[in-house]
């Protein structure tokens, strides 16, 4: 795909596309993976008296709709932290989620339970999202929330939880950007949500990161990090 903004990554016996929408798509199964959506996080902050912008959940759902449409996914798997907290269940957030689901009635949706989901409750089930209390498993991939749960010899695993970012350094300044982080057979996705922080993991010599911008690009290993 020479003109595609995606980066094609071989994970034998399958192949996935790392998308600048901060998602992973497996064409063979039609499955789109995202992690750490954190819907309603801004509403939680406002409920606790912290002034933050409105509209971040709507922006996140718009990007999710665009990702589904661009790749033609038939299944969506959220790798944990779909909602941020119980206070995320504001009327505006729930209305936005209901409208999003109404626009995608044929999309099979599942959520691998993350640490925030356990506190937020399983409200997503009312919108047709199946909650999984263990890893999501197919013939080719495993999906978990925390990379620490990922050790299964010989299996490729997709994970979230970390919100990986990488620092790109210029001569006079630097910039932190979201990235996909591959260590061994574990691919950790960047946080999908519009209102999320990031963590710079300590990268090993064999690790590979894929920088997210207008397109997804591998960061040369010899580049100082």
Residue ranges and their predicted role:
Residues 1-79, 84-225:
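Extended recognition/assembly regions associated with phosphoester-bond processing machinery
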